[in-house]
Amino acid sequence: MYLKQNLMSYLAQAIGELKSQIHAYLQQSTNELVRFQVKLDKVDLLAWLKGQSAYPQFYLHFRDEEKALAALGAVQSFSQLNLAQEFIEESGFPLVGGLQFQGTAQFVLPKMLVEQDNKGTLVSFFVKNEQSANDTLAHLKTFENLTALSALPKQIPLHTELRANERTWCDWVNQALVEIKSGELTKIVLANETTFHLKQAINAYDFLAESEKQNQGCYHFLWAENSHSVFVGSTPERLFAREYNLLLTEALAGTASVSESEEETQSQANWLLNDEKNLKENWLVVEDISQNLRKQVESFDVSNVELKPLRKVQHLIRKIRANLTAHYADVNILKAIHPTAAVSGLPQQQAKMILSEIETFDRGWYAGTLGVMSDVCSEFCVAIRSAFIEGHRIRVFAGAGIVAGSQPLEEWKEIERKAAGLISLFAEEK
């Protein structure tokens, strides 16, 4: 166990402030939903979450700025997007959560929301009655007992199960190419699931902390509804970020390898920037997003194609900037662009139907979207490069976009490289 040296003094002051706020609230004898806020010194959010026993748990470390948030528990839950949007507009309070790949929604107003940036740490407590008001003091004291993060041990998996081995994967790709050739599809994104059975259980918080160190330039996320299955990942892809009516989104598609040789990596980068298939695959995503947002934006600007370098792979990326119409709503943006052609295909509904016929597993949260939604600003990542950690078992996902001209074996190599970003954190090669 460890504690930052000056955290105790911050906690003592914060508890005193909170007691005063709670006393004033209780004097009003109301069941109105309210927010209490206190400031703390910087806290290791993953270490804090690791020591908590309440669920659900949510964590998001943002990609493009030094900002992170963690959420614990649920005061209210929403499975209907429209009700979630109405709640935000009426209360002004934020929600965390997202959509699974197939569109199942889950958003919560947490009991505790911890927001952290380079200015400090702000803790919000959402309460709606006397009992929950009194509970906030106990919740605040949980910062006294941070559970130290541990180094992630490398181990040789006892057993590995591939949802699709190389041969089956090539069959899947060939099925997809038949659909593309027939004109049913322009693009489809196939995914694979690999399950590792381990001698030593993996702690999801230690795993994500290690991924934060090694997989830079990514969003790092965690979503857990219970202690038995924790969804984590380090994704390079933004679904969208909104501040007032300014919308930022992107097309991230097209992949090449990264090697230990700088010369080979640069050669792959040059090839990627000039490869017709990959450039087309990326542009299809741009067209899909622009088409789906056309009724919600007043202007739409697309950057030139760039490289997005990562530890194991590099991608093509085009950044998109749009001004929303006066009557924008985050839920309408979510409905319009999730899932994008970067994780599903084109046309979207046809691609999703064919994926359900080819793939032999339920994606669940994989290739879904997770984030935070509020009245002023919202941000969501695309939940790829992800895994379910389930004690002695970890299920890792990776996908590849299939278009006319795709080669099955090359696509197999691509998903192996993508999955390696997480697998290399815990698995030793035999």
Curated annotation (Swiss-Prot):
Its EC number is 5.4.4.2. PANTHER family: ISOCHORISMATE SYNTHASE 2, CHLOROPLASTIC, PTHR47253. The keyword Magnesium applies. Keywords: Isomerase, Magnesium, Menaquinone biosynthesis, Metal-binding. The active site is at 187 (proton acceptor), 237 (proton donor). Belongs to the isochorismate synthase family. One of its GO terms (molecular function) is isochorismate synthase activity. Pfam families: Chorismate_bind. InterPro entries: ADC_synthase (IPR005801), Chorismate_C (IPR015890), IsoChor_synthase (IPR004561), MenF (IPR034681), MenF-like (IPR044250). The gene is menF. Its cofactor is Mg(2+). Catalyzes the conversion of chorismate to isochorismate. It comes from Haemophilus influenzae (strain ATCC 51907 / DSM 11121 / KW20 / Rd). This is Isochorismate synthase MenF. Mg(2+) binds at residues 281, 414. GO terms for biological process: L-tryptophan biosynthetic process; menaquinone biosynthetic process. It is an enzyme of class 5 (isomerase). The keyword Isomerase applies. Pathway: Quinol/quinone metabolism; 1,4-dihydroxy-2-naphthoate biosynthesis; 1,4-dihydroxy-2-naphthoate from chorismate: step 1/7; Quinol/quinone metabolism; menaquinone biosynthesis. It catalyses: chorismate = isochorismate. It comes from the Bacteria.
